[in-house]
Structure formats: structure tokens, C-alpha cells
Amino acid sequence: MKSILGKKIGMTQIFNEDGSVVPVTVIEAGPMVVTQIKTKEKEGYNAIQVGYIEKKEKHVNQPMRGHFGKAGVSFKKHLREFKINDDEQFNLGDEIKLDIFQDGDVVDVIGISKGKGTQGAIVRHNYSRGPMGHGSKSHRVAGARSAGSYPARVFKGRKGSGKMGHDRVTVQNLKIVKVDNERNLLLIKGAVPGNKGGVVTVREAIKSK
């Protein structure tokens, strides 16, 4: 299992040996703690649940206090589950650190994209606008999206205005430029989804070229 949770710090740039500029996203990744182990015999599949970022006791409800107490770990703010292979062995309380990755690895980054609120069809779906003059009354509307008297409604799923952003987004095949184990920092080439401070999942690329 080569996956880790991290917090997006922001973007910066570094320079290659030839002087070219490389835009990178800085992610503070790990360490994660194993809070639960699932087995094929009991749950039907092999997986581990991990916790990330400390959480104050007053914000933890009673069921979760029992869950963390059973694992013998401190309270965590974020929990995620990762499937593991049959030959991988983990124990409750094990730490998963950044050293599972190396410089040059290709990864996928999963995060929640920035929320844009309610947007019109032009911004949300890249529609073309209508004429701006000559008596036109349809400047930025979505246009015809259904038939007339029948079915007399718009079918579900048609593109139009509405909520934009705040979706789970996966960016594939990004290259790790540098791994800083001392400061738990990942420098990944390019942009990753989400706001500064947002939690992202960095995993080994599934469709690496």
C-alpha cells in the first residue's frame, strides 16, 4: 500500500539544474496511524483504517472515543480506509510515514475542488453566449434544453446553472519532485485540487505511463 494523507500547503517553484522553472505544490504528508484492521475472514476484504491530524477530546463523541481507545491511539480528525494485499501486515498503532515514496515517483492526488457556489451555464459548462444586441433577450441563458408541449419538462441530468465545484477530483500521473522526510513535505510537480489547508490523498499512480 503506497498511499498517504496530507494537507495542501500551497504552490511555489523550484529550479532544475539547467535553470528551468518547475511549478510545484507543497503537501505536508503524514504521519498516519493505523486505527482499525479489516480482514477477509471478518469483513470480506483486507483493509486498514488510518487516522490523520490530532483532534481535541471535547470534539470527539462517545462511540469514536471507544473506537480510538480500542486501537490504543490518540484522537484523530480524519479517517480513511485503504485496501491492502494479503501479504501486507499491519498492527494497530503503526505509523505510516512519508518514506514510502521516493523522488521521481508518479502519483495520483485526490482532493475536494474549490467551491464556486452557484454559477450560470456559461461558466459551469463553457456554453457560448447569445447575441448581445439587435433585440436579443437571450444573452447568457442556457438556451433550448427540452422539447415543447411534450414532455413539457427538462429531463434530469441536462446541463444548466447550479452548484459548481466542491467535488471529489482525482489528478493522475503527477511526478514527485522531492521528498523531505525531516519536515514531512512532498513537492509534487503541477497543481492539485483543493484549497490551502485542504486534506488530500496521495497514492501510487494507477495508470502510470
Swiss-Prot record:
Region (Disordered): 127-147
Stretches of the chain forming a coiled coil according to its record: none
Domain of life: Bacteria
Keyword Ribosomal protein: yes
Function per UniProt: One of the primary rRNA binding proteins, it binds directly near the 3'-end of the 23S rRNA, where it nucleates assembly of the 50S subunit.
Oligomeric and partner information: Part of the 50S ribosomal subunit. Forms a cluster with proteins L14 and L19.
Name listed for the protein in its UniProt record: Large ribosomal subunit protein uL3
Lineage of the organism: Bacteria, Bacillati, Bacillota, Tissierellia, Tissierellales
Gene from which this protein is expressed: rplC
